[in-house]
């Protein structure tokens, strides 16, 4: 029997965030997530989906002839077969990224994958789910992301940046304002005032298409 994954959608669009923001990318959105962040913009991926073989997923990805592939969710690592999918995507020559909540062990993920680890802030309502052991595994190919809901979240993220030396461990540290919760101009001003070694990140796809699935 072939390995399978439960998939919500596979689509081709522009990457809205991370270091490849603005670049055409194929997104493979896996179904299911053990977290319930209060600002989640992909709750439609919590359940449902279609059970598909890895071969069928790879075939669809190849049909777009992409350079970049992003495996996202939900929480992709909640499905064990995400690990072989990531490896096979790398073997096929794509530049692969993984968007993960940071609540699950990333050690088995192929080192060629850029792991985008989302450290949950107090404002997410899931801060207790952070797996800080993952920080020791970060390399220059990886990225750490904070979604910030308030000044309190910002101060918390700065404390973690300093405590763990995140800018020395990961290739990028990304600060994003939670949509409709934190004013992006305020966040920009705070980053400049504190001279932080982080990248301000806005979700390009929301500016272009709001929260339309498949975009």
Please report, for each region that a protein language model flagged, where it lies by residue.
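N-terminal [4Fe-4S]-dependent radical SAM core
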Residues: 1-49, 64, 206, 210-215
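Conserved Radical SAM active-site core
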Residues: 5, 24-25, 35-113
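Generic structural signal for well-ordered alpha-helical scaffold segments
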Residues: 15, 58-62, 162
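Short linear functional motifs in flexible/disordered or boundary regions
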Residues: 19, 40, 49-52, 69, ...
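A secondary-structure boundary/capping signal
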Residues: 29, 72-73, 203
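Conserved AdoMet/S-adenosylmethionine-binding subsite of the radical SAM
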Residues: 78-215
């Amino acid at each position: 029997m072939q390995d399978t994954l439960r998939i919500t959608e596979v689509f081709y669009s522009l990457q809205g965030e991370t270091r490849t923001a603005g670049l055409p990318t194929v997104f493979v959105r896996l179904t299911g997530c053990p977290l319930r962040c209060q600002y989640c913009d992909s709750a439609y991926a919590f359940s449902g989906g279609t059970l598909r073989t890895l071969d069928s997923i790879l075939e669809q990805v190849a049909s777009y002839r992409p350079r970049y592939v992003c495996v996202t969710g939900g929480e992709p690592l909640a499905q064990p077969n995400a690990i072989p999918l990531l490896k096979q995507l790398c073997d096929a020559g794509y530049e692969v990224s993984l968007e993960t909540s940071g609540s699950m062990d990333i050690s088995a993920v192929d080192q060629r994958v850029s792991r985008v680890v989302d450290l949950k802030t107090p404002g997410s309502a899931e801060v207790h789910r952070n797996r800080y052991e993952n920080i020791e595994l970060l390399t220059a190919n990886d990225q750490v992301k904070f979604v910030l809901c308030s000044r309190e979240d910002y101060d918390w993220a700065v404390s973690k940046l300093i405590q763990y030396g995140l800018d020395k461990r990961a290739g990028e540290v990304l600060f994003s304002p939670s949509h409709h919760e934190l004013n992006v101009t305020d966040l920009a001003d705070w980053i400049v005032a504190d001279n932080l070694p982080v990248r301000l990140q806005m979700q390009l796809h929301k500016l272009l298409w709001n929260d339309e699935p498949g975009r």
